[in-house]
Regions:
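Small-residue-rich hydrophobic segments that form or flank transmembrane alpha-helices
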Residues: 12-21, 25-86, 93, 150, ...
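Transmembrane helix exit motif
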Residues: 8, 67-79, 118-141
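Selective transmembrane alpha-helices of multi-pass membrane proteins
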Residues: 94-99, 110-130, 219-223
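Single conserved hydrophobic/aromatic residue that forms the stacking wall/gate
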Residues: 1-7, 11
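Small-residue-mediated transmembrane helix hinge/kink sites in multi-pass secondary transporters
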Residues: 76, 101-106
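Hydrophobic alpha-helical transmembrane segments of multi-pass integral membrane proteins
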Residues: 19, 146-159
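Alpha-helical transmembrane segments of integral membrane proteins
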Residues: 59, 89, 112-119, 144, ...
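Short, amphipathic, aromatic/basic-enriched membrane-interface segments that mark the entry/exit
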Residues: 5, 58, 81-90, 134-140
Length: 223
């Protein structure tokens, strides 16, 4: 029975990975929107310490996005749908924002983070439902504005455990990029969010004694 239960868990995680990958490719989001709530439920069932469950779920989700993000970004690169001129300064800002977001998130109580994630999911639903549109006129922001935008995107993404597409796609659309380029460039932005967010959660959880075995900081490796 234990073996069949373990096999079932593996299949569930594989299905979750496929779904996250599809979301990353189609909408430029990293799949964390689905992964975080599922991991929270999984960690509760495993009996992990309540004080670290949400943080562990977010950190683990961010680390999973590294693989889906790389795959998605590579697919968009092959289709020439990444605007590298806009990507570079935003990605630079993301590095600092994602690190800061990880360190900030672990200082916040899990309940507040859960409420924040729930509100965020509602906002995403509204955004999709009403198909909020932005400027179609091409804008060329200065680098400092792009770096600032990247730091905000990186910060919020690391706090919520997502690939950032919900923030970066509308941002790139507001600059007048086509929807295809906005999604492709956003998918590329998911890679530095995931890498530096993961790095932040690893460092932030280095000396936390309540984390379960097989954790690397706030990353639960078996997931």
């Amino acid at each position: 029975h234990t073996r069949s239960s373990a096999a079932s868990d593996v299949y569930k995680r594989q299905a979750l990975g496929v779904l996250a990958g599809l979301l990353a490719g189609m909408f430029g989001i990293g799949g964390g929107l689905i992964i975080v709530p599922v991991l929270i439920g999984t960690f509760i069932n495993l009996g992990f310490d309540e004080s670290i469950i949400v943080h562990l779920a977010i950190g683990t989700a961010i680390s999973c996005i590294i693989f889906t993000g790389l795959s998605s970004a590579n697919a968009h690169r092959k289709k020439n749908s990444i605007d590298f001129d806009n990507f570079r300064p935003v990605a630079f800002g993301i590095i600092f924002g994602a690190l800061a977001g990880a360190f900030f998130a672990v200082q916040i109580k899990g309940l507040f983070l859960k409420i924040s994630i729930a509100i965020f999911i509602m906002i995403v639903g509204i955004q999709i439902l009403f198909d909020l549109s932005f400027s179609s006129k091409r804008i060329h922001p200065n680098k400092n504005k792009s770096i600032f935008a990247g730091s905000v995107i990186g910060f919020l993404s690391a706090v919520l455990g997502i690939g950032g597409g919900t923030f970066s796609v509308p941002y790139f659309k507001s600059l007048g990029l086509s929807l295809t380029s906005s999604i492709g460039t956003s998918a590329a932005c998911g890679v530095p969010i995931a890498i530096f967010g993961t790095f932040g959660y690893i460092i932030a959880g280095t000396n936390v004694m309540t984390l379960p075995e097989m954790s690397l900081g706030y990353i639960y490796l078996p997931a």
